Amino acid sequence: MNKQQPSLTERKYLLPFVLITTLFFLWGFARAILDVLNKHFQNELNISIAQSAFIQVTTYLGYFIMAIPAGLFINRFGYRRGVVFGLLLFALGAFLFVPGAYHSTFEVFLVALFVLGCGLTFLETAANPYVTELGSEQTATSRLNLSQSFNGMGSIFATFSVGLFLFRADSEGGNVAVPYVVLGIVVLIIALVFSRVQLPEIHPSVGEEQEGGGLHNLSLLFKKPMFVLGLAALLAYEVAEISINSYFINFVTGQGWMTDKVASMVLTAALAFFMIGRFGGSWVMRRVSAQRVLLVCAVGCVVSMCMVLLNVGSLSLIGLLVNYFFEAIMFPTIFSLALKDLGVLTKSASSVLMMTPVGGCGFLLMGLIADGGNPVLPFVLPLAGFAVVLAYAWKVNRARR
C-alpha cells in the first residue's frame, strides 16, 4: 500500500509561504549585484581585484556581526517584526548609495553595503527557519529549496539588468546609485505590506527548555554533533559559492573570452543553471532523500572545480557553468538538515547558521592570488570548500543508514 505524499505546505500556511518567499527573491537580487559591482568599481575607481573584495568582506561581515542579535530580536519580537526591521535596514543601506555616488568614495559604498548586509541578515535569519516550519517535517528540505529557487530568480534578474546598466558605454550608464534607489523604494513598499499582515508565529512543540536564555541555547547547540558538522559544511559552501560568483566576471574577462558586458550576461546564464538546479532539486527531493541528492551534487561540484583548475579552455568554462547547477541545492539542504530535530533551539540555530555568509570574505584571498598573476589558481579555494561539503554529505548519508 502506497503512502500518500505529504503536501509541500498546509493550506493555512499558503499565504505566509508566498509572502516569505518574496524575501528570497529580494536578497538574491541584492547579493547578486555584488558580483557585478566588483568589476564596475575596478573600472570606475581603479582598484585591484583584492581591493574590490572588500565589497564582499563588508557585506558579509554584517552577517557575522548581526546574526546572533537578529536571532535574539526574532526570539523576543517574532518573525514579522524581524522581517520588517530587516527590510528597513535593507532600504537604508540601498539609499546610502546616493551619497556614495555623489562623492565617488569607495569607503562610503562600503558603509552602505555593511548596513544593507545587516538588513539581509535579519531577513535570512527569519525566513529560512520559518519556511522549514510551514508544513510537514518530511517536506521541509523540499519546501526550502522551492523558496530558495526564487532567490535564484532574483540573482538572474540582478546580474542581467544591473549588468546591462552599469556596463553601458553612454554617459547615463555607470551611475550605481540608480538601481539601488529603485531597490530601496521596492523594499520600503514590501516592508509596508509586511507591517500590515499578520504572520502566524511557529512554536516548536518539542525540544529542550529555554532556561538560561540565548547563551544557554547556544551552549546546547554546540553539544549536538550533527548541527556542528552542518555549520562547518555551510561555512565551507559559502566560501566556495560566494567566491566563485564574485570572481566570475574577472576570470572570464581575464582569460580573454569576453567583454565585461558579455561576461555579466554569461553570469546571468550561469545563475539560470543555478535556479534550474534549485527547482529541480525541490522536485527530486520529494522522491529521493536530501542526503543522497547532496552527496551526488557535492561530487559534481568537486569534479567541476577540477575541470576549471585543469585550464583547458572552453571545457573549463563548461565546468564552471555546470558547477552552478550542482551547487544550487546545497545551502537550503545543509541548512534544513542542520536544523533537523532541534525543536525550540531552531531560532537560535538559525542565527548561528546565518553567520556563515562571512565565508564570502574568502574572495579576498582569491583576489590576492589572482593579483599575483595566476587567474586559475584561485579556484583551489572553492575546490577545498566543496570537498568539505562532500565529506559532510558522506557523513549524513552514513548516519541515515
Label each PLM-derived region with a short phrase:
Residues 66-79, 166, 277-289, 370:
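Helix-to-loop junctions at the C-terminal end of transmembrane segments
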Residues 34-35, 219-268:
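Extracytoplasmic gate region of multi-pass secondary transporters
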Residues 54-72, 268-280:
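Central cavity-lining transmembrane alpha-helices of secondary-active solute carriers
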Residues 138, 143-198:
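Helix-loop-helix hairpin linking two adjacent transmembrane segments in secondary transporters
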Residues 122-136, 328-343:
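Intracellular juxtamembrane helix-capping segments at the cytosolic ends
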